[in-house]
Amino acid sequence: MLKKTKIAIAGIGTVGSGVIELFKKNSIQKNFDIEITAIASRRKLKKTDLGSNSINFFNDAEKLIGFNNYDILVELIGGDEGISKKIVFDALKKGKNVV
């Protein structure tokens, strides 16, 4: 049996919202053992928007640096400097996969 793959998502714009919708509809989770463990977004979201009460929500992406309960970081903030660069490099230093 495969271990559960834990995902952290940084940035909930158009693409990030679409990823969340896919998870809420369970279209991905039916075929893969995947769990979203964290979301970082400046956008105000309600727990019901996330599809699960067990997802850690950060309104500051920099707080993902102190969070370790994920295997893959999905970085959707964009840009090659600033916070997006910082969280990607932090994840790579921790041995995490980054998309």
Segments from the language model and where they lie:
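Nucleotide donor/acceptor-binding cores
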Residues: K3-T5
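Hydrophobic Val/Ile/Leu positions in short beta-strands of Rossmann-like dinucleotide-binding domains
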Residues: I7-I9
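Glycine-rich Rossmann-fold phosphate-binding loop(s) that bind the pyrophosphate
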Residues: I12
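N-terminal Rossmann-fold NAD(P) dinucleotide-binding loop
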Residues: G16-S17
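Catalytic-loop region of hydrolases
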Residues: I20-F23
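NAD(P)-binding Rossmann-fold cofactor-contacting core
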Residues: K25-L50
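A structured beta-alpha segment of the ubiquitous adenosine-cofactor-binding alpha/beta core
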Residues: I55-I72, I77-D80
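Beta-strand-loop-alpha-helix segment that lines the small-molecule cofactor/substrate pocket
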Residues: K86-V99
